[in-house]
């Protein structure tokens, strides 16, 4: 018999003081010998030979104790050229976002450092010589301003186990640094807010390839109690856009020691709990049940607040729902809870 789904983080009232257990990992080993059969060198994928997507979700605690969820995402895949950023105050649940399309650029030919973004001060910069063990991310719009530096103090998650998966009819490559040490500041209103690095972390995600999905929901989840992190993919291809395929439903699970497992999942969105956007005329589920049989896991994932949609002028650039989520339930047969990010995109 399945245990009752716990509520924990998910039932905090809107005005509650946020007290999420944000903390970076403290891995200090070599990424050149991670003991996994990756098909590429992580540093090489930050070069100009690879376009695609650079993204971060940062779970921030300020020096004064306030907590925030910060998103930065640059896409340059030959079709889309867009930068998105947002800040969600986890106490007031006030959401701010910035969207800029066009005139983006990225450079990283050795020995130069990665620079990927749109306009001045909006995007990603490699600080370390390998372009990924220390990085900087910025947003300079008055509505969303931050300057973060993060360090790869976390064991990587290599999506699919080797770094390549079939998303629809085509290959996609993806790797992540899920719990980086993070420093810097945000500006909220007129206040500059310094970050407490010991109580903050960043998930850096790098992805490229053609892919074949016309809609998807992706999660990056943390289980603080056990040190597990999960990259969960779900998606479909519309029959009028490509040949019908089996829907994408899988998770890559990385444990506290860095071991990776690729698992089938069952994914059920709660269509009675949705956010409908008048600007896009699309509906976004806000709650989901995810089952991972090989981990004796069933979790209920919930968006912390309804509107976390980042949208532009509704031209050729797709909008994205990049939301802070919490979850609770069962993992490895024991009660668990955690937090993470969800990305929902409809092309």
Curated annotation (Swiss-Prot):
Entry's EC annotation: 4.2.1.-
Pathway named in the protein's UniProt entry: Secondary metabolite biosynthesis; Alkaloid biosynthesis; Mycotoxin biosynthesis
Leader peptide range in chain numbering: 1-18
Function: Dehydratase; part of the gene cluster that mediates the biosynthesis of the aspoquinolone mycotoxins. The first step of the pathway is catalyzed by the nonribosomal peptide synthetase asqK that condenses anthranilic acid and O-methyl-L-tyrosine to produce 4'-methoxycyclopeptin. 4'-methoxycyclopeptin is then converted to 4'-methoxydehydrocyclopeptin by the ketoglutarate-dependent dioxygenase asqJ.
SUPFAM superfamilies given in the database record: AttH-like
Keywords assigned: Glycoprotein, Lyase, Signal
Positions annotated as glycosylated: 51, 103, 131, 143, 215, 264, 281
Record-linked PANTHER family: ATTH DOMAIN-CONTAINING PROTEIN-RELATED, TERPENE CYCLASE ASQC
Record organism: Emericella nidulans (strain FGSC A4 / ATCC 38163 / CBS 112.46 / NRRL 194 / M139)
Catalyzed reactions: [(1'E)-5'-(3',3'-dimethyloxiran-2'-yl)-3'-hydroxy-3'-methylpent-1'-en-1'-yl]-quinolinone B = (1'E,3'E)-5-(3,3-dimethyloxiran-2-yl)-3-methylhexa-1,3-dienyl-quinolinone B + H2O
Molecular-function annotations in GO: lyase activity
Presence of keyword Thylakoid: no
Xref: InterPro entries: AttH-like_dom_sf (IPR023374), AttH_dom (IPR010791), Fungal_Dehydratase/Hydratase (IPR053112)
Protein name listed in UniProt: Dehydratase asqC
